[in-house]
């Protein structure tokens, strides 16, 4: 099956959209890990997690974003980010808070991948052929 590559505009739009979760997950995770650990610990206990869970969760968050950023492992990264964001949705639902943000992030993860890799188009068709 021959696949035509995505247009230049679609590929670049995919890279830009994909950069949003990568930046938030990796750079944000590193920032919170090294510079705002007290704030993260407070947030974790607010949601019912033990304070000791903050660092392992951040350490798990950072590689998910990095794996997604690498084209050869982007699919695995998208799956890992989806699982991570599913946990975020569950946490917000359990706390009775809005859970819109992690869902939007998940949509951005898959939309970015869909735009830059044509192999996902048959799996997630936006229109009938």
Model-derived regions: residue spans:
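A generic alpha-helix surface/boundary motif
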Residues: 37-38, 60-62, 84
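Short hydrophobic/aromatic segments of transmembrane alpha-helices and their interfaces
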Residues: 23, 48, 57-59, 102-103
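Hydrophobic alpha-helical transmembrane segments
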Residues: 1-7, 46-56
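Core segments of alpha-helical transmembrane spans in multipass integral membrane proteins
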Residues: 49-69, 76
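Extended, low-polarity transmembrane helix blocks
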Residues: 1-28, 70-129
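Solvent-exposed, well-ordered loop and adjacent helix/strand elements within mature globular domains
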Residues: 26-53
